């Protein structure tokens, strides 16, 4: 069974090719991963990161959130 961090990192790997601000998102992912957060907490923290961020970073974080949610749905449907 995948841990929350494993699933979050997989979501980042899956979506990284679609991001304009890869270094900024990678920094956020590295900061959040390994902290023992639940996926719901990670998504809330990412949404907080979006507040006040420039538009392309907001879009990149939304891509990451969507991919994380997609993997969660896939995991729970199998």
Regions found by a protein language model. Name each.
Residues 2-36:
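N-terminal acidic leader/helix
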Residues 2-4, 9-16, 45, 49, ...:
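Non-catalytic all-alpha helical scaffold/repeat segments
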Residues 30-33, 47, 69:
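Alpha-helical repeat scaffolds in large eukaryotic proteins
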Residues 37-44:
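Short, well-ordered alpha-helical segments
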Residues 18, 39, 53-56:
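Alpha-solenoid repeat scaffolds
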Residues 51-78:
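Charged low-complexity stretches with an acidic bias
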């Amino acid at each position: 069974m995948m841990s929350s961090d494993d699933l979050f990192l997989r979501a980042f790997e899956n979506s990284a090719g679609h991001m304009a601000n890869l270094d900024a998102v990678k920094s956020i992912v590295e900061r959040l991963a390994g902290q023992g957060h639940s996926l719901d907490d990670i998504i809330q923290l990412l949404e907080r990161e979006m507040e006040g961020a420039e538009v392309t970073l907001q879009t990149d974080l939304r891509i990451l959130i969507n991919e994380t949610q997609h993997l969660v749905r896939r995991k729970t449907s199998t």
